[in-house]
Amino acid sequence: MKLFSGKATKTALIAAALAVTPTVAFAAGENLASDDFVGISFWLISMALVASTAFFFIETQRVEGKWKTSLTVSGLVTLVAAVHYFYMRDVWISTGETPTVYRYIDWLITVPLLMIEFYLILRAIANVSSGIFWRLTIGTLIMLVGGYAGEAGYMNVWLGFVIGMVGWFYILYEIFAGEAGKLSAEQAPESVKSAFSTMRWIVTIGWAIYPLGYFFGYMTASASMESLNVIYNLADVLNKIAFGVIIWSVAVSESEKA
């Protein structure tokens, strides 16, 4: 028996996304200074993520059933990120310190979900082995655990950097030359192939911002924490919102063909 209609599901998803916003938006009760450009970037990106969440959840009702999961995951990515960004903003305003713990908690949830998107869009058009899912997940966790351990001081920053890079390169191999990349090239229709390719380049070029920030911020100390946070924030816009827009575009395109 179907418990919820499509309209009811859409309403519930949007309500859940918006309900958390007032609670976390005023968590610290601090005023935002007009010259605090890092704090301003946290706020702008927080609201952009909330708006993206509402958009992705609404659009799930526009696409075919096989694409709904992908679009819902895109909305979950931006929702989780929005909540964490409000708290990261509070940490920055209250202490002036980099919110490393909140940022990595966000990444530990959202980055694996982004990687799962590769698996989901391939599953929508072909029979896909679960090996793709697990390889992308494992590569993501290796990358993030290495990065966090290095930034938080649990291991040597160089060792953390190397471990993180190994995880990233493992992901790149899978989506370019591994089973996922081959499946996209051989079985995907042109619209899916194009989306998959764009997503790959976001993971290649967009994600390169993070190890560069790590290198200049923690290994050489040549970048200020203010610059590092702004760079990370802008990178998250590209790597979360743009990623979801690509999924939305191919989902709508393929649904309209059906």
Model-assigned labels for residue ranges:
Residues 1-27:
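N-terminal secretory/membrane targeting signals
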